[in-house]
């Protein structure tokens, strides 16, 4: 908004907040690093502003060539309402240059990018309430060993970020919740935690995408977009489970279709109605209904035209 453009305007803005009133009335309730006894209220306000300006500059969220100005990273942080601590985590994603030196197989490169982006997302401050609770670890070890886990955790499961990763991967991989009685005790908490994760994660991955576009990191942008599509559909991109997006098709129906070599939405749309009925053991009319639903799915195409010689 341009309201704050130097230290003095920052102090003026902060002086109009409730924090200023509280600092004046109860300064002992607000301990500041490096604070000195006897400092005036104005000096303490200046210390707060200077500290935060330095933090924003160190994290590349603020530039100060002539006057304080938000960078593209700072704009993304404001656009998607991302906390400062989370923004620092999102900006810690490694560029491709460092990964390509040690990884050469294309499919492995893609896996590393997806895993690194997912690993960064689950550390977000917005998810601090999603943590391990008493007796939950056995459940998450069971989920982690399921076939649908794209990136199973290979070390001991003990950190909250690992729990979050397992919940997201279980959702995207179509992993069914264990049916045993002990796991059932944690199902309600599992559903609540999943709701928290998916309530925030869409804007966080959009923030990652905008940052990677600004960095002109093509591979990281592509993989972030792939992860965003997966999170939006709640299934891994390019997975047969994409067919779950069609109403009336659940995990069991998808498994039957895959067994019959129908592995994608495109393949399903190319399948005749009577064969869909036969594969899914449905009555006449079900296949026609599925095909009519598929017609409403968007089909995106990109075309490229050469405009002249490229030197």
What annotation goes with each model-predicted range?
Residues 285-311:
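A structural signal for beta-rich interaction modules in eukaryotic proteins
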Residues 28-34, 68-70, 271-272:
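Short linear loop/turn motifs
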Residues 25-29, 81, 258-259, 269-271:
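Short coil/turn segments at secondary-structure boundaries
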Residues 1-2, 11, 37, 41-45, ...:
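C-terminal helical accessory/scaffold domains
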Residues 73, 236-290:
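Helix-hairpin-helix
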Residues 1-28, 35, 58-61:
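C-terminal helicase module of SF1/SF2 nucleic-acid helicases/translocases
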């Amino acid at each position: 908004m341009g309201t704050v453009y130097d230290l003095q305007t920052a102090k003026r803005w902060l002086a109009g907040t409730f924090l200023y009133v509280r600092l004046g009335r109860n300064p002992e309730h607000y301990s500041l690093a490096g604070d000195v006894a006897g400092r005036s209220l104005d000096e303490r306000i200046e210390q707060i502003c200077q500290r935060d300006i330095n933090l924003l500059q160190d994290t590349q969220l603020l530039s100060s060539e002539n006057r304080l100005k938000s960078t593209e990273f700072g704009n993304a942080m404001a656009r998607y309402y991302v906390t400062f601590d989370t923004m620092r985590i999102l900006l810690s994603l490694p560029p491709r240059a460092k990964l390509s030196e040690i990884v050469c197989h294309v499919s492995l490169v893609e896996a590393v990018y997806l895993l690194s982006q997912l690993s960064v997302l689950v550390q977000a401050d917005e998810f601090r309430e999603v943590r391990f609770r008493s007796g939950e670890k056995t459940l998450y070890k069971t989920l982690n060993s399921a076939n649908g886990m794209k990136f199973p955790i290979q070390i001991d499961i003990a950190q909250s970020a690992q729990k979050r990763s397992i919940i997201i991967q279980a959702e995207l991989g179509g992993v069914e919740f264990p049916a045993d009685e002990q796991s059932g005790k944690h199902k309600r908490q599992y559903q609540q935690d999943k709701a928290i994760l998916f309530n925030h994660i869409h804007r966080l991955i959009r923030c990652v995408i905008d940052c990677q576009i600004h960095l002109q990191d093509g591979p990281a942008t592509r993989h972030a977009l792939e992860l965003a599509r997966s999170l939006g559909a709640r299934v891994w991109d390019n997975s047969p489970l994409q067919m779950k997006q069609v109403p009336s098709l659940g995990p069991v129906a998808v498994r039957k279709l895959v067994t019959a070599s129908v592995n994608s939405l495109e393949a399903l749309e190319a399948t005749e109605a009577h064969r869909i009925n036969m594969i899914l053991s449905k009555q006449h009319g079900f296949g026609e209904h599925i095909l009519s639903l598929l017609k409403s799915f968007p089909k995106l195409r990109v075309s490229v035209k050469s405009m002249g010689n490229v030197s």
